[in-house]
Amino acid sequence: EYVAYVNAKASLGYDTVDEMKADARNYLESSKESSKKSAIRSAVMDKLGEVCTVKELPDGLLDARMEEVMAQYESYYCSDGSSLKDYVENTADQDYDEFVSNVTDEVTSDLKTQMILEAIAEKEGIEFDQDGFDSYVGNLMSNYSYSDESTLYKSYGLSADSGKEYLKKVYVCNMALQKVVDSATVEDEAGTE
């Protein structure tokens, strides 16, 4: 990753070795800070999973999300007309039923996390805001090289509309998670804050 970064910077050119070293230092510090933030978010998510309980998913929610996820897999991996079952059984180390079971477990976990974060958002008065969402969508498009919003939305749902609605929920959940992260007391492995 750093090699690609240096190559990109190299086309801009450095005037001195000190400039290159300073840029390398900045890159490493930024990378370290990003890793730290990611680790904190992950630890907060783990803790939320420990202390919060979702007794059951609303009727139809799992089925609807599974339909979307399986359609996404099929769209991504089966553009040649093959079935997802054939694709999984020919390329994965599991049979199709095992694959579906694993995906179901993952989607169930994701939905429970989503419900926990939606409850936090509601309790904290965190609401959807269009400007923030537009910025979020712009970042997704830039980071993952989507050419237009419709294509981005379609990659998250059965249609552009359902994908957009899903991303709106993800956006609000991310704001709720950030609120929890910002209020968390974080200690390193040595026990210092």
Residue ranges and their predicted role:
Residues 1-97, 108-193:
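Peptidyl-prolyl cis-trans isomerase
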Residues 101-106:
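Conserved interaction-surface patches within small, structured recognition/assembly domains
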